[in-house]
Structures are given as structure tokens and as C-alpha cells.
Amino acid sequence: MSRSSKKGPYVDIKLLDKIEAMNKANEKRAIRTWSRDSTIFPQMIGHTILVHDGRRHVPVYITENMVGHKLGEFAPTRFFRGHGGKKADKRGKVK
């Protein structure tokens, strides 16, 4: 179920304040955040935000197509390494 339309989109206030301050100063530097549930606003376009994935911060460059999505969508938390497949023989040769 999605968020109620009467509430409006959620964005972390501290993150939005940092973005607006950087826009006023006309500077571009990476912002580190743990707020994966924040919605991407048009003011964020052109900035790089380091989104935490549980282990490290993943750099996410915000483009126009990302507006309306959540920051966490662009920093995956689970990495699929593949299913079993053919196991190597003790001699090191696959048959």
C-alpha cells in the first residue's frame, strides 16, 4: 500500500535542508544519508547522494527520471551471487 495522497511525499528534513543550502551556495558535493525512504524531489537533480545499503554508502547521482522515486530504490541491499551449478571436481576439473 502506498502513502496517502493527502499526507504528501516524505523526505528527511535534514537532507532537504542540506540540498537547499547547497543549491543557494551553488556547490556540488556528495551528501551522506541513511534515509532510504526519502522521496526524490526536483531540487535534488544534479546532486550526488551517498545512500546507505546496510554495509556501505552507495553513490547515487540524481537525474530527472528519478524524481518521485525513493532513494533506497537505487542502492540495492541484497546481492545475488548465483545458484549452485556444476561443482569442481577434487582434481580441479569440471566434467
Curated annotation (Swiss-Prot):
The superkingdom listed in its UniProt entry is Bacteria
Q: Does this entry carry the keyword Membrane? A: no
- Gene Ontology MF terms in the entry: rRNA binding; structural constituent of ribosome
Q: Name one GO cellular component term.
A: small ribosomal subunit
The record's Gene Ontology biological-process terms are: ribosomal small subunit assembly; translation
Q: Keyword annotations for this protein?
A: Ribonucleoprotein, Ribosomal protein, RNA-binding, rRNA-binding
Q: What does this protein do?
A: Protein S19 forms a complex with S13 that binds strongly to the 16S ribosomal RNA.
**PANTHER family under this entry?**
RIBOSOMAL PROTEIN S19P FAMILY MEMBER, SMALL RIBOSOMAL SUBUNIT PROTEIN US19M
Family that this chain belongs to: Belongs to the universal ribosomal protein uS19 family.
The protein here is known as: Small ribosomal subunit protein uS19
Give the originating organism.
Answer: Chloroflexus aggregans (strain MD-66 / DSM 9485)
